[in-house]
Amino acid sequence: MKIINFIWKTRHDAYKVGKYWRHIPDCKTREACHVCQAEESMDHILTECSATGQKLIWELAETMWDERGLPWVWPSLGLILGNNLADFRSPCNTALTGANQFFTILISEFTYLIWKLRCEWRIEHGGNPDKIPEPEKIRRLWFQTLSRRLKLDCLMTNRSRYGSRAIQTSLVDKTWWIVLQNRSNLPSDWPKGGISGVLVGSGSACPPGRNR
C-alpha cells in the first residue's frame, strides 16, 4: 500500500521536492541536490542522482532481470509511473504474464527503496555527503526488499486466509521461479511449501521451457 500511495502522489506532484521550494523564503537551498547541484526533482532523485544509490539499485535490478533473457528498459520517470503497463511478449506475440509481473515488481519495489534512502539521507542526515549510503548497505537492502516481496507473494497464495485477494499459485510460479536457487529441484506447488532463496545477479542459464 505504501508503494501504491507513493506512486499516486508522485503522479500528482504531491511531494515537496525541487522547484516547490523556489519561492519560499529561507528554503531556496532545498531546491537543488546537495551533491549534483541540479534541481532535486523526483526525476533527478529516482533516475539521475549519484548520491543515494539509484544507479546501483537499477544495475542490480537489470542483473536480476537478465535471468529472464528479455531486454532491460532503463527506468525513466514515465516508465516508473506507468510500471503496471509492462507488456513483454513472446516471439508468437503471447503476453509473458510472469515477466510483466516481475518487471512491475522490480520497478515499483526499487523505486520506493530509492525514495526511502533519499529521505533518510536528506531528512535524518541533512544531505551530508559523508552520510551517503555505502554500496554494501544498498546491496543488503536490495536483497532484503526483493526477498520480502517474494515471501509476501508466497503467503498471498493462501486462499483460506486471503479469499478473493489471494494470488494464484501459477502466477507466483511464473513470476519468481526463474530467479530461485535450485529451481530445477522445486515441486510444482513450491509457493505453498516454502522457497530456497533468490538469485541476485546470477549468470546461470535458464532451464528450457520456463521463460514465462
Task: List PLM regions with ranges.
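Family-specific functional microsites
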Residues: 1-212
